[in-house]
Amino acid sequence: MKKRKELKRDKVAGTPAGIRESLKKATTEMLVLFLLERKPMYTYEMMQTIKLMSDGKISLTNLYIAIYRLEDFQFIRKDFEELSDEDRTRIYFSITENGRLYLRRLIDEYREFTQAVEEILKTQFPLTPLE
């Protein structure tokens, strides 16, 4: 019997939704670090900022896994806490110096990879087989 997570994965595999999820997972850490390089932010603020900056095309509803991973690798740190008007604790995160270095590498790798993909997609068909 398949587990619930496997069933969900099977449902989106090979679909545009599945592709979008894979792309989001691959870029989430980079986007979090990009925002935190500008100023300390709390998680919900990051989600809203990404949604706004992408004109609603990117909606990262769960950044927590990426944030925990970035914190474990000491690329970000908890900066301070404040109480919101709704009596919720907001934990602000900031980027570390190692996080800045990691962000530069991520951006370089991302740009190199996406440029290579763009070059492939510009290729006119028919392709001739390699010999």
State what each model feature region is:
Residues 20-64:
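N-terminal helix-turn-helix DNA-binding core of bacterial DNA-binding proteins
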Residues 67-71:
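Short, hydrophobic-biased segments on the C-terminal half of alpha helices
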Residues 100-131:
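Amphipathic alpha-helical dimerization/coiled-coil segments
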Residues 20-22, 75, 127-128:
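Short, contiguous hydrophobic alpha-helices characteristic of membrane insertion segments
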Residues 73-88:
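Beta-hairpin "wing" of winged helix-turn-helix
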Residues 1-31, 38, 88-89, 97, ...:
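Intrinsically disordered, low-complexity serine/threonine- and proline-rich regulatory segments
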